[in-house]
From Swiss-Prot:
Organism superkingdom: Bacteria
Function of the protein: Involved in the production of the root hair deformation (HAD) factor specifically on medicago.
Localization terms from the record: Cytoplasm
Listed InterPro entries: GATase_2_dom (IPR017932), Ntn_hydrolases_N (IPR029055)
Gene Ontology, cellular component aspect: cytosol
Chief subcellular location: cytoplasm
Gene Ontology molecular function: glutamine-fructose-6-phosphate transaminase (isomerizing) activity
EC number: 2.6.1.16
Annotated Pfam families: GATase_6 (PF13522)
Organism: Rhizobium leguminosarum bv. trifolii
UniProt name for this protein: Glutamine--fructose-6-phosphate aminotransferase [isomerizing]
Keyword terms, alphabetized: Aminotransferase, Cytoplasm, Glutamine amidotransferase, Nodulation, Plasmid, Transferase
Amino acid sequence: AGVATISGGNLERCRAQGKLVNLEMRLEQQPLNGMIGIGHTRWATHGAPTERNAHPHIVDGIAVVHNGIIENFAELKAELEATGADFETSTDSEVVAHLLAK
């Protein structure tokens, strides 16, 4: 699970593996500053259910959460990597953030 907020034009993100209560505990320890944000609880379809793969994905100031499957993500990822995109996760959803950042 994860959440991203915006404060003063900057994105902040907090993610945690497992149950939503894990994210809640992390946010209690390290609160985010923003008052507007997006969040997601993830059911892994591509990529392991790890903190690194948790949404939101952030690329160049764009935060993305996604529910669903991107069928052609391998092809899109390869095309983006060929143009210099650096992927942090093994999820299909991260391609959306990279495409929007282009």
